[in-house]
């Protein structure tokens, strides 16, 4: 038995080594292939287009259901999803043309601005949950919306300043700083979901078992918290690699597989799942937690 294992062992190791080399070779071949680059970027464009269309359809359904209400949190959330995914779809549909734009800062803006808008879109969910949580505990929510706008304003201002500095002096250190800043923003968003999603989940658990909709709302909050926390945490880690490792650079044409995996994990799948989970339309009458944005 021992001798047989000694014979099989090296053979299995050699086969694994061969498979590894083949996988690396295939990865490099796809990355170098102009045709494969275009195919994978167009796949991303189509997927983003589908998510954008779904968000728009849901926005129209909500408007038809409650036309008497203005821009509610739910409507703004779906509109921003439509906008972010629609812009991403156009960017990837014309990805090769985007790479030719000059000055180079225009490329950074087109590739990074949707990420900032994605942060704002899902920060809106954190705001909504924070309002529900504090209202349920009879705590004033007057400072939440100003805080939301202030945080987003600071994030956008800092990013715009970084873009202007990069435009003025395009050095590698500033690009790294910009990517690390966004990694920090992503970590902040992940912690926001963990804090308020977790608080709301624990609060719902304390409701009486017979409470109407308790089980469904628990699942909704639990799933969305897990999905959004994971996607922003993955984005944070990936942006750190992206900043310091050229092999993980997402802003180039010759990393199409990495782009496909990254954007699937941090934007397309999370957006699709969250839109599916939050697909329920608001009630027509007797609305208690459906507030217009003021």
Swiss-Prot record:
Residues 61-75, 130-147, 194-220, 278-294 are cytoplasmic. InterPro entries: THH1/TOM1/TOM3, THH1/TOM1/TOM3_dom. It comes from the Eukaryota. It is found in: Vacuole membrane. The keyword Membrane applies. The chain crosses the membrane at residues 40-60, 76-94, 109-129, 148-168, 173-193, 221-241, 257-277. GO terms for biological process: viral replication complex formation and maintenance. Keywords: Glycoprotein, Membrane, Transmembrane, Transmembrane helix, Vacuole. The keyword Transmembrane helix applies. PANTHER family: THH1_TOM1_TOM3 DOMAIN-CONTAINING PROTEIN (PTHR31142:SF3), TOBAMOVIRUS MULTIPLICATION PROTEIN 1-LIKE ISOFORM X1 (PTHR31142). Necessary for the efficient intracellular multiplication of tobamoviruses, probably being a membrane anchor promoting the formation of the replication complex. This is Tobamovirus multiplication protein 3. It comes from Nicotiana tabacum (Common tobacco). The gene is TOM3.
């Amino acid at each position: 038995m021992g001798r047989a294992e000694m014979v099989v062992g090296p053979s299995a190791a050699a086969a694994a080594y061969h498979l590894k080399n083949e996988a690396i070779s295939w990865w490099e071949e796809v990355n170098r292939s102009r045709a494969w680059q275009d195919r994978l970027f167009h796949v991303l464009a189509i997927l983003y287009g589908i998510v954008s269309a779904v968000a728009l359809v849901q926005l129209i359904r909500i408007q038809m259901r409650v036309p008497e209400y203005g821009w509610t949190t739910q409507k703004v959330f779906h509109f921003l999803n439509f906008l972010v995914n629609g812009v991403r779809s156009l960017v990837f549909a014309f990805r090769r043309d985007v790479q030719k734009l000059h000055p180079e800062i225009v490329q950074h803006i087109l590739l990074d601005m949707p990420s900032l808008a994605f942060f704002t879109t899902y920060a809106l969910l954190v705001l909504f949950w924070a309002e529900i949580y504090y209202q349920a505990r009879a705590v004033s929510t007057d400072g939440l919306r100003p805080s939301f706008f202030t945080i987003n304003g600071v994030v956008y201002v800092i990013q715009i300043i970084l873009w202007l500095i990069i435009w003025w002096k395009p050095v590698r250190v500033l690009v790294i700083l910009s990517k690390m800043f966004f990694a920090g923003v992503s970590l902040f968003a992940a912690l926001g979901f963990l804090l308020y999603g977790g608080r709301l989940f624990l609060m719902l658990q304390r409701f009486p078992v017979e409470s109407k909709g308790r089980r469904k709302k628990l699942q909704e909050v639990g799933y969305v918290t897990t999905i959004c926390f994971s996607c922003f945490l993955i984005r944070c880690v990936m942006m750190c690699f992206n900043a310091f490792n050229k092999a993980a650079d997402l802003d180039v044409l010759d990393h199409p597989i990495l782009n496909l995996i990254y954007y699937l994990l941090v934007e397309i799948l999370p957006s699709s799942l969250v839109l599916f989970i939050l697909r329920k339309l608001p009630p027509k009458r007797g609305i208690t937690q459906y507030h217009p944005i003021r």
